[in-house]
Amino acid sequence: MGRAIGIDLGTTNSCVAIMQGKDAKVIENKEGARTTPSIVAFTSSGERLIGAPAKRQATTNANNTFFATKRLIGRQYSDPEMKNLGVPYKVFAAKNGDAWVKTTDGKEYSPSQIGAFILQNLKEAAEAYLGEEVKDAVITVPAYFNDSQRQATKDAGKIAGLNVLRIINEPTAAALAYGLDKKHGHTIVVYDLGGGTFDVSVLEIGDGVFEVKATNGDTHLGGEDFDNAVVNYLLGEFKKSNGIDLKNDPMAMQRIKEAAEKAKVELSSAMETEVNLPFVTVDASGPKHLNIKLTRAKLESLVNDLIERTIIPCKKALEDAGLSASQIGEVVLVGGMTRMPKVIEKVKEFFGKDPHRGVNPDEVVAIGAAIQAGIIQGDVRDVLLLDVTPLSLGIETLGGVFTPLIERNTTIPTKKSQVFSTAEDNQTAVTIKVHQGERKLAIDNKLLGQFSLEGIPPAPRGVPQIEVTFDIDANGIAHVSAKDKATGKEQKIRIQSSGGLSEDEINRMVREAEEKAQEDEKRKKFIEVKNQADSLVHSTEKSLTEYGDKISPEDKSAIENAVNELKEVSKSDNIDDADSIQQKVTNLSQLSMKLGEAMYKESQQQQGGESSSTTNNEEEKVVDSDYQDMDNKEENK
């Protein structure tokens, strides 16, 4: 079995780690950073950029730069959360109703594909570090992700060429990293406020057992919302002073978003900062500049409602766990937003104690995922992890009522069976709608899918007995099977969700990802050979200027022609021309050896001349010198 990695696929940033002996190590990416921005961009030349390179060009390519797509994963376009996303790129309803994204040239991508590109990038970083292929991974998700979102994340792993060993909840992963070396039993709360989601989990830890007692959260609350609050404030202030609304200017919006995020981060350590964006727009009177001072107090007033929203899930989680805030031994802060002083203050106020800040909030989830990978592979022993399902799973019954079969905060994996029957005489089929959520009416909860039990022998209503079994696996993903108790016939049923990727779509995306990886490799080779060509042309032209008169006119003409041919072929932006450029590079390299010989010959002559000159100079400098016999000098004293 190969090495397995742990990946935190975040809304804003992602991170990869691996177990080395008894410790987990965060792996640096190609740029040498320990976290990678969860951003994918497509340039006008068709190049795909991931991470920091994608982030750097976002201002000039906002419509083709996809960030925060974790907020779209596993969601229907009609979901209320899809309104007012505040992103410059196009989000649309795919054929299955899911929210997908589209580039300006019409290429369509599912959020799972965008996630797969990021996972692929992290996989490559791990392979470069380990020097071997990586196939297995544990990937984290917000604890409050529903079945569709978990399945879509697992699909992303498959598209990236990974065998997903386990989908693990982010707070649980953080608890693993925090408590692996702690022997004494105590109860902790993991407060995880990240870039796009908020989770809170209550766990009991002791003697290698990590038991989640309750979890709650909000999958649409995080740093992105804090950024948007600052963006809206800056837009309002600019409109007040200049009378210009920048909302429809993608380039200005991208600059303001980046400045808002930067200001938010700075105000975690400073009391005041200045947002200064020269030439943010232009009108008939000339260019306009944005220059606004932002204090920590103002920022806190802008985001206070968002911080207060995190307390509601905290109350629910404690209530479900049957505990009070005073019974919590430690509160562990996870996620970049927990660096904000106001967030720390609010957590302290609610739980009545200073939160634990001894873990790196950006890396602890990936470290926990790596530990879970180690547990699965047998590298980490004597650790038992007992997680829970965050949402109730059930069906729609008469009158549209939601009837839960598996309650929220049930330890997983778990299984529950219930007997159903027919509502009419001689009914030969029953349609069962599977929902997930906490609302009383089925329509208010997430429809995971529906299936029909067919071929039921005709009988009076209420007589047939169909036992339907729901089970949730260790990934938190639901499965359904059905059995006709009269005939003993059993049928495994795959929930056909109204959304989600089909097996054919996943396979197509896997192929596309592999093809894209090959294309990326070709593009890399193309860029390298073009750089080699530019360097060779420059050095050859320089050598021709200095030593062109030292070689024969025929050789000089051949080299000049080869330089011009290489210049011409290097103008191409077609990556398929890499071999042609390479041939011209090889040809010029061989021809320019004549120049090298001339340079070497002249160098030898110069060295010979210098040697002769040095000898003559030394002979000219020989002079007779007076000397004193020191012994005689002593005697004469």
From Swiss-Prot:
Transmembrane segments: none
Region (Disordered), start-end ranges: 596-637
Biased composition (Low complexity): 602-616
Keywords: ATP-binding, Chaperone, Nucleotide-binding, Phosphoprotein, Stress response
Biased composition (Basic and acidic residues): 618-637
InterPro entries with a match to the protein in the record: ATPase_NBD, Chaperone_DnaK, Heat_shock_70_CS, HSP70_C_sf, HSP70_peptide-bd_sf, Hsp_70_fam
Residue(s) carrying Phosphothreonine: 197
Keyword Repressor: no
Induction context: By stress conditions e.g. heat shock.
GO MF: ATP binding; ATP-dependent protein folding chaperone; unfolded protein binding
Matches recorded under PANTHER family: HEAT SHOCK PROTEIN 70KDA
Function: Acts as a chaperone.
Family, similarity comment: Belongs to the heat shock protein 70 family.
NCBIfam families assigned to the protein according to its UniProt record, in alphabetical order: PRK00290.1 (NF001413), PRK05183.1 (NF003520), prok_dnaK (TIGR02350)
Protein's name in the database: Chaperone protein DnaK
Record lineage: Bacteria, Pseudomonadati, Pseudomonadota, Alphaproteobacteria, Rickettsiales
